[in-house]
Amino acid sequence: MQTPKFRLFAGPNASGKTYVFKKLRKGNLIPKEIYVNADKIEAELEKKRKFYFNSYRVRTNEEEFRSYVLRSGLFREKINDENFPDQFSVRSGVLKVRKDVQVNSYHASFVATYLAEKLFESRQSFAFETVMSHPSKLEFLRIARNVGYKTYLYFIFTDDLNTNLARVQLRVSDGGHAVSPEHTLARAPRTFKLLPRAFALADSAFVIDNSNEARLVLKKENSILYRAERIPAILRKELASIVRSFSGTVREISN
């Protein structure tokens, strides 16, 4: 049986994670795997009030989903309302949100992370997109390795967070989802801080500067670390930490 693959696409809001994923897939650099994106799930829940777990070839039921929500760290830290799970129902693999409920990012986050758990159970290859501003997102890489997946990290960033803020505004003007400047700026340092740990957990890892045209600045593959000559200042500290702690061969990549 072929080894399943888990790909984590991480980075600050509006760094271009979905763009890089689509570019890699279009170039046949990664296969056409399931892509779990909480933003797209939120949009689907807002529009249809439904999410079709059964279209992902996973089995679920309402009791199991409720139990997952109640034991999650997100529920304990951000919600802690025992009536919150009543906003959902699950029948025949289809999740529905009550009509009187205003869908938000928490609803989408529960669906996305639960779907990831079920995909691991069914040993399907898939990719997951996250800002990775909380240590809990590192658990995906740990779980994947523990259950026999080959793991990949794609960390996408820009060299100036003002670029991210401008992209959010452009996305909203095109009908996309909004993220407040305060949230974008507050999350980014936490995301950067977690990069060395995520890099170490992944079997293969790629750090991509997506300020303009996507540019690879650090890569780990086959126990060799490749680093670019030009390292953006915004991530210099974290990337230096990765290089110092790497025990294998380090080589330069020119770009």
Language model features with spans:
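Phosphate-binding P-loop
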Residues: 1-4, 118-120
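Short hydrophobic/aromatic beta-strand immediately N-terminal to the Walker A/P-loop
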Residues: 6-8
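The conserved Walker
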Residues: 12-13
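Walker A/P-loop
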Residues: 18
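The feature captures the helix immediately C-terminal to the Walker
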Residues: 21-22
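Conserved substrate/cofactor phosphate-moiety recognition/catalytic segment
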Residues: 25-121
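A glycine- and Lys/Arg-enriched "phosphate-lid" helix/loop adjacent to the NTP-binding pocket
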Residues: 146-194
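NTP-dependent small-molecule kinase module
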Residues: 199-255
